[in-house]
C-alpha cells in the first residue's frame, strides 16, 4: 500500500507530539503496524487492522506496544510448530512405545530361561521409566541451556533418545549370548535414558512458545494416539517375530532377541532422518511460528493453594492412570498363560489387538477437544476405566473370567485411563502462569515414571498379590483420584481446544 506525501502531512497534523523513540528491534512490518495503530487512535478509531497469515499458514505475531518493548508478545491461538517437526516427535513417541512393548510378550520367557522369576520380568519391563525419572533433571539442563534464551532445544533429547535406545537394544539382544540375566536389566536401563523423551513429547506438543491454545489439547491427544499405535505395533511385532524365530538356535538371533534387533535397526534409521530433516525453533526472532519467552519484569508470580493442590492432583492422576495401564499390560502374558494357556505369540496378539481396537477411538477423541473441556475428557475417561475394573473384579471373584469379556474389559480400561490422562499438560498450561509450565511437565512425568515401574512390578507379581487383590488395588486408587476430580471440578474449568 502506497502512502502519498500529502496524506502523511495531513496525518501529522493530527498526531500528538511524542518524545522521539529509539529504534526498536521489531521488524519494519511491526513498526508500520504501530504507526497505523497510533494514527487510528487519534482520527480513525473505527479502523481495525487485520492479521495476515504467513506462508506457513501461521498468523504473524500481534504485538502490543505501550512504549515498553518488554511486554509479552501474543501468539495466534491456532499456531503450531513445523509439521515435519511434529511428525518426528510423534514418530519418536511411537518408536519409544514400541521399544517399551516389544519386550512384553517374551519378557517372562526370556528371564525364565536365564534364571529369572516373574517378578524380575516385571522389573525388566518397569525399570526403564524409573531410570528416565532419574535422568530427567540432567536432561532438562542439557535441553535448556542459557544460550537458548528460555527456549527448549528439543533436538538434543531427541538425538539422545536415539543413541540410548540403540545401546539398550544392543545389550538386551546380547544377554542370551552372554547367558547373563542382568545384562537384560542393564539394556533396559539404557532404554530408560531414552524414555526421558516421554516428557518432551507432551512438552513439545503443548509448548506455549509456539503452540496456540486452540491446538494444545488436539496435539496432546494425538500423542496419546501415537502411544497407542506404538504399543500395538510393538506388542504385535514382539509376538510375531518370536513365533517366526521359535525354532532358531542361533545365540544372537533367536525368538528372545529378534524383536530387540528389529527396534535397533528402526532407531538407527530414525536417527539419520532426524539429523537431516528436524527443524528446531530457536530464539533468533526469525521464525514467525514462535513467540519470545515472556519477560516477567522481576515480578514474583506465586501459586495459590488451589493451584498447588491441582499440581498434586495432576501428579496423582498421571500416577494412577499409568499404574493401571502398565500393571495390566505387564500382567496379561502371566494372567493369560495361567487362565487360557497363552504363549508369547498369543499374548502379543491379545495386546496388539486391544490397541488396534483402541486406536480409532483415541483418534476420534482428538476431535472432542474442540467441543469438550479438558475436565470433561478426564471425567468420562475415569468413569469408563472404573466401570471396567468393577466388572472385572466381580467376574474374577466369581471365577467367570472368559477370554472375550476379559479382552473387552481390558480394552475399555486402557482406553478410559488413556483418555483420562491425555489433557493433563494442556489443562495445566491453560490454568497456570508460563513460569510454571516446565514444573508441571516434571511433576506429571514423575507420576508417570513411578507408575510405570511400580505398576509393571505389581502386574508381574499378580499371582503373588492374588488377582482379586491386584484388581481391587487398581480400583481403589482410581476411585480416590475420581473423588479428587469432583472436588476440584469448578477450579479446573478451561476453554475448549
Curated annotation (Swiss-Prot):
Belongs to the major facilitator superfamily. Keywords: Membrane, Transmembrane, Transmembrane helix, Transport. It comes from Schizosaccharomyces pombe (strain 972 / ATCC 24843). One of its GO terms (molecular function) is transmembrane transporter activity. Pfam families: MFS_1. One of its GO terms (cellular component) is membrane. It is a multi-pass membrane protein. GO terms for biological process: transmembrane transport. The chain crosses the membrane at residues 86-106, 120-140, 155-175, 180-200, 222-242, 258-278, 309-329, 348-368, 378-398, 407-427, 438-458, 468-488. Its main location: membrane. Residues 58-79 are annotated as: Disordered. InterPro entries: MFS, MFS_Domain-Containing_Protein, MFS_trans_sf. This is Uncharacterized MFS-type transporter C613.02. Coiled coil: none annotated. It is found in: Membrane.
Amino acid at each position: 500500500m502506497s502512502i502519498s506525501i500529502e496524506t502523511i502531512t495531513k496525518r501529522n497534523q493530527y498526531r500528538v507530539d511524542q518524545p522521539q523513540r529509539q529504534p526498536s528491534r521489531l521488524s519494519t512490518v511491526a513498526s508500520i503496524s504501530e504507526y497505523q495503530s497510533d494514527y487510528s487512535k487519534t482520527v480513525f478509531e473505527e479502523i481495525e487492522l487485520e492479521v495476515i497469515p504467513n506462508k506457513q499458514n501461521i498468523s504473524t505475531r500481534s504485538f502490543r506496544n505501550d512504549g515498553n518493548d518488554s511486554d509479552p508478545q501474543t501468539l495466534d491461538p491456532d499456531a503450531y510448530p513445523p509439521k515435519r517437526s511434529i511428525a518426528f516427535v510423534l514418530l519418536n513417541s511411537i518408536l519409544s512405545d514400541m521399544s517399551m512393548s516389544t519386550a512384553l510378550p517374551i519378557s517372562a520367557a526370556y528371564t525364565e530361561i536365564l534364571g529369572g522369576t516373574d517378578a524380575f520380568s516385571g522389573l525388566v519391563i518397569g525399570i526403564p521409566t524409573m531410570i528416565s525419572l532419574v535422568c530427567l533433571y540432567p536432561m532438562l539442563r542439557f535441553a535448556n541451556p542459557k544460550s537458548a534464551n528460555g527456549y527448549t532445544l528439543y533436538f538434543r533429547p531427541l538425538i539422545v533418545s536415539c543413541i540410548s535406545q540403540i545401546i539398550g537394544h544392543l545389550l538386551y539382544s546380547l544377554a542370551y549370548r552372554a547367558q547373563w540375566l542382568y545384562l537384560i536389566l542393564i539394556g533396559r536401563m539404557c532404554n530408560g535414558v531414552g524414555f526421558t523423551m516421554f516428557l518432551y513429547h507432551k512438552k513439545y506438543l503443548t509448548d506455549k512458545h509456539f503452540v496456540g491454545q486452540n491446538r494444545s489439547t488436539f496435539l496432546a491427544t494425538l500423542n496419546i494416539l501415537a502411544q497407542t499405535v506404538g504399543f500395538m505395533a510393538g506388542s504385535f511385532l514382539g509376538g510375531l517375530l518370536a513365533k517366526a524365530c521359535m525354532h532358531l538356535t542361533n545365540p544372537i538371533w533367536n525368538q528372545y532377541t529378534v524383536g530387540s534387533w528389529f527396534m535397533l535397526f528402526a532407531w538407527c534409521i530414525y536417527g539419520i532422518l532426524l539429523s537431516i530433516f528436524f527443524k528446531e525453533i530457536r530464539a533468533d526472532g526469525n521464525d514467525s511460528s514462535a513467540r519470545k519467552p515472556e519477560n516477567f519484569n522481576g515480578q514474583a508470580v506465586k501459586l495459590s493453594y488451589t493451584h498447588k493442590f491441582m499440581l498434586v492432583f495432576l501428579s496423582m492422576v498421571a500416577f494412577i492412570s499409568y499404574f493401571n495401564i502398565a500393571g495390566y499390560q505387564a500382567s496379561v502374558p502371566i494372567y493369560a498363560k495361567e487362565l487360557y494357556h497363552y504363549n508369547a505369540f498369543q499374548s502379543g496378539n491379545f495386546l496388539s489387538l486391544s490397541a488396534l481396537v483402541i486406536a480409532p477411538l483415541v483418534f476420534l477423541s482428538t476431535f472432542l477437544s474442540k467441543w469438550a473441556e479438558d475436565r470433561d475428557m478426564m471425567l468420562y475417561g475415569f468413569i469408563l476405566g472404573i466401570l471396567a475394573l468393577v466388572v472385572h473384579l466381580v467376574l474374577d471373584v466369581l471365577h467367570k473370567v472368559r477370554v472375550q469379556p476379559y479382552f473387552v474389559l481390558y480394552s475399555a480400561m486402557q482406553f478410559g485411563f488413556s483418555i483420562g490422562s491425555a489433557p493433563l499438560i494442556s489443562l495445566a498450561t491453560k490454568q497456570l502462569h508460563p513460569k510454571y509450565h516446565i514444573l508441571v511437565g516434571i511433576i506429571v512425568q514423575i507420576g508417570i515414571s513411578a507408575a510405570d515401574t511400580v505398576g509393571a512390578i505389581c502386574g508381574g507379581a499378580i499371582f503373588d498379590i492374588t488377582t482379586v487383590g491386584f484388581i481391587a488395588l487398581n480400583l481403589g486408587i482410581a476411585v480416590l483420584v475420581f473423588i479428587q476430580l469432583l472436588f476440584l471440578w469448578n477450579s479446573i474449568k478451561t476453554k475448549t481446544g
